[in-house]
C-alpha cells in the first residue's frame, strides 16, 4: 500500500499523480480530493513502493485530480477545483501553482499558496462546455505540447462528459490552455514579417471616386465593398499556380478556406485541406520543398495539413508528407516573400 485513508480522515487516497523528477531521479506521488488535503509522498523508483519512513506532506486544499510537472526550474502542481458530477451545472476548472521545491509551497500568480486555497486558472468553462478537469500533459516534441482533460458536460453532445485535447502553451513560465482550432476562412500570416500567404496572381486595383482629402465631401460617403472572387477569378491562370507572401489586403487570392479533409488525423485534430475560398485551388507541398496551389483536391498526403498551436502561441502548418522525403517539414517564410518547407 502506497497511501490509504479512512472515512474520518482529512484526505481521500484517490486521484494519484506521478512525477519522476528529472533533476534528481526521485519519484513522487500526489493524491487527495476536494474534501481535504492534497498530499505528497515519495516512492521508490525501482519498486513503486513508498520510501521507508517517508511521511506525507500537505501541499494544497480545495482541489483534486492533481498532476505534477517539472519545467525550467519550477515544479508545478495542477489541480481540479470546483464541483463535479452535475453535468451542465458542474463548476470544475483547472488551476495551478508553482514552487522551486517539489514539497512546496505551491504559489499562484498573485502570491497565494495552494495550501490556502490559491491557484491560477488554466482553463474554465468555455464554448458551451462546462467543467474541465483531470489535467494531463503530453510532450509531442520540443515546442509542441498537448493537454488532455475532460469536460463534465458538452452542450452540443447532449450534455455528455467528453474527452478534450488542447494545445498547452507556456507564458512567463505559466501553463496556459491553447486555442481550440475551428474550420473556417483565414489569413495565413508569417511570424517573420507579417506578410500573408497568397496565390501568385495579378493584383487587381479597386476603382474609387477621387476627391482631394483637404476638401469637405459634397455628398454622403459610401462604404467600399470588398473585392469579390467573381470580379477577378476569370483573369487567373488555369492549372497550377505558384504561392507567395505579400501585404494582406483582404483580397480573394489571400483568403484560405481550411476544412477537415476526412482523411485521418493526429493527436488533437484532423488533417485539413486548405484552398482559396470559393475555389478548388488547394495548397500542396512539392518535392522542391515549396508550395503551390493545385486546381483540384486529390487527397494526396502533400495536400493534407496538420495545424498545431505551439508552446509560444504561434501556429505550425505542416503537410502530412512531402514528396521525396520522410523528413518532417513545416510551412515557413524564406525571406519576406517566399514561402517554403
Regions found by a protein language model. Name each.
Residues 19-21, 69-70, 107, 138-139, ...:
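Well-ordered beta-strand positions
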Residues 1-14, 20-63, 70-123, 142-185, ...:
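Beta-rich carbohydrate-recognition and catalytic domains
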Residues 183-341:
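Lectin-like carbohydrate-binding module/patch detector with strong preference for beta-trefoil
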Residues 9-11, 60-61, 129-130, 160-161, ...:
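Short solvent-exposed loop/turn micro-motifs enriched in small/polar/acidic residues
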Residues 15-17, 125-139:
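Signature of short aromatic-glycine-proline-rich micro-motifs recurring in repeat-based ectodomains
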Residues 131-133, 161-162, 326-328:
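Short, surface-exposed coil-to-beta transition loops
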Residues 12-15, 62-65, 131-133, 252, ...:
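Beta-rich catalytic cores
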Residues 17, 67, 95-98, 136, ...:
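Residues located in well-ordered beta-strands
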Amino acid at each position: 500500500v502506497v497511501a490509504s485513508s479512512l472515512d474520518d480522515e482529512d484526505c481521500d487516497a484517490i486521484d494519484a499523480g506521478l512525477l519522476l523528477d528529472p533533476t534528481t531521479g526521485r519519484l513522487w506521488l500526489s493524491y487527495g480530493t476536494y474534501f481535504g488535503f492534497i498530499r505528497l509522498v515519495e516512492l521508490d523508483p525501482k519498486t513503486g513502493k513508498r520510501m521507508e519512513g517517508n511521511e506525507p506532506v500537505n501541499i494544497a486544499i480545495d482541489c483534486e485530480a492533481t498532476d505534477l510537472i517539472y519545467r525550467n526550474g519550477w515544479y508545478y502542481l495542477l489541480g481540479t477545483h470546483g464541483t463535479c458530477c452535475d453535468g451542465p451545472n458542474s463548476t470544475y476548472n483547472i488551476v495551478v501553482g508553482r514552487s522551486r521545491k517539489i514539497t512546496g509551497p505551491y504559489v499562484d500568480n498573485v502570491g497565494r499558496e495552494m495550501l490556502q486555497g490559491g491557484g491560477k486558472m488554466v482553463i474554465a468553462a468555455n464554448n458551451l462546455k462546462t467543467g474541465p478537469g483531470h489535467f494531463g500533459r503530453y510532450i509531442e516534441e520540443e515546442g509542441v505540447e498537448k493537454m488532455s482533460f475532460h469536460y463534465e458536460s458538452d452542450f452540443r453532445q447532449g450534455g455528455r462528459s467528453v474527452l478534450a485535447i488542447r494545445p498547452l502553451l507556456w507564458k512567463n513560465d505559466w501553463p496556459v490552455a491553447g486555442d481550440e482550432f475551428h474550420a473556417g476562412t483565414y489569413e495565413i500570416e508569417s511570424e517573420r514579417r507579417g506578410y500573408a500567404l497568397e496565390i501568385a496572381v495579378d493584383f487587381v486595383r479597386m476603382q474609387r471616386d477621387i476627391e482631394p482629402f483637404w476638401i469637405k465631401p459634397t455628398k454622403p460617403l459610401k462604404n467600399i465593398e470588398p473585392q469579390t472572387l467573381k470580379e477577378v477569378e476569370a483573369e487567373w491562370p488555369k492549372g497550377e499556380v505558384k504561392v507567395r507572401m505579400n501585404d494582406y489586403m483582404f483580397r480573394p487570392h489571400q483568403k484560405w478556406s481550411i476544412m477537415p479533409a476526412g482523411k485521418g488525423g493526429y493527436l488533437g485534430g484532423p488533417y485539413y485541406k486548405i484552398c482559396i475560398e470559393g475555389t478548388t485551388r488547394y495548397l500542396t507541398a512539392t518535392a522542391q520543398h515549396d508550395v503551390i496551389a493545385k486546381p483540384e483536391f486529390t487527397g494526396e498526403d502533400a495536400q493534407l495539413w496538420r495545424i498545431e498551436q505551439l508552446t509560444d502561441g504561434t501556429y505550425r502548418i505542416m503537410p502530412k508528407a512531402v514528396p521525396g522525403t520522410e523528413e518532417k517539414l513545416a510551412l515557413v517564410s524564406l525571406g519576406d516573400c517566399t514561402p517554403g518547407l
